[in-house]
């Protein structure tokens, strides 16, 4: 029975699975974003966050622990010098998983796993202010364009240059709208 056993098997032997995780963590910390399947991304998240936590400790023992799992010494150096200091004030949640859809060949659900890049020093009230700005922005934009239209004098348009004609895409006409226009 499989009681109290953490992690997914992913249809691989233990050695293959561990090697795959080590390769994925090395690539993830090197590129800071990779595309993989949903299940692999969820498993990778826990390992990567443990590595970043080791990087935040910053001592020699933590560096050796990370080096025993990560395959490339340059990536270990990057983890301790560039990645971990970014998350010094963050208590966890260093990664984000974004679902992409399905892979055409085998219908596997794909995701992008990436490091979170937002600033923690922003005041907590900014989210509400941004939502208010988003609600009022369309109204203000509509009023501004209406004011511009009223203020601009009517000028007859000259023939457009040949470059402008080529640069403009052809108008797409919906057949349903065309039938309605003929019926009127």
Swiss-Prot record:
Source species, domain of life: Bacteria
UniProt keyword annotation of Transferase present: no
Molecular function in Gene Ontology: structural constituent of ribosome
Keyword Ribosomal protein: yes
InterPro entries on file: Ribosomal_bL17, Ribosomal_bL17_CS, Ribosomal_bL17_sf
GO cellular component: cytosolic large ribosomal subunit
SUPFAM superfamilies in UniProt: Prokaryotic ribosomal protein L17 (SSF64263)
A Pfam family reported for this protein in Swiss-Prot or TrEMBL: Ribosomal_L17
PROSITE patterns: RIBOSOMAL_L17 (PS01167)
Any GO BP annotation: translation
Keywords: Ribonucleoprotein, Ribosomal protein
Coiled coil regions, renumbered to chain: none
NCBIfam families (alphabetical): L17
Subunit structure: Part of the 50S ribosomal subunit. Contacts protein L32.
Family named by the database record: Belongs to the bacterial ribosomal protein bL17 family.
Name this protein carries in UniProt: Large ribosomal subunit protein bL17
């Amino acid at each position: 029975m499989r009681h109290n056993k953490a992690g997914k098997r992913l249809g691989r032997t233990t050695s293959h699975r561990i090697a795959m995780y080590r390769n994925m963590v090395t690539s993830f910390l090197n590129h800071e974003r990779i595309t993989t399947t949903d299940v692999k991304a969820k498993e990778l998240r826990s390992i990567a966050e443990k590595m970043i936590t080791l990087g935040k400790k910053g001592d020699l023992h933590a560096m050796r622990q990370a080096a025993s799992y990560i395959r490339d010494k340059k990536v270990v150096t990057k983890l301790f010098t560039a990645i971990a200091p970014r998350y010094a004030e963050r208590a966890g949640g260093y990664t984000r998983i974004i679902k992409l859809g399905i892979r055409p060949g085998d219908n596997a659900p794909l995701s992008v796993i990436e490091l979170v890049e937002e600033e923690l020093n922003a005041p907590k009230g900014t989210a509400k202010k941004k939502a208010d700005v988003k609600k009022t922005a369309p109204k203000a934009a509509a009023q501004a364009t209406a004011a511009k239209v009223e203020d601009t004098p009517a000028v007859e348009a000259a023939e457009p240059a040949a470059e402008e004609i080529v640069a403009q895409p052809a108008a797409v006409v919906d057949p349903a709208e065309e039938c309605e226009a003929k019926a009127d």
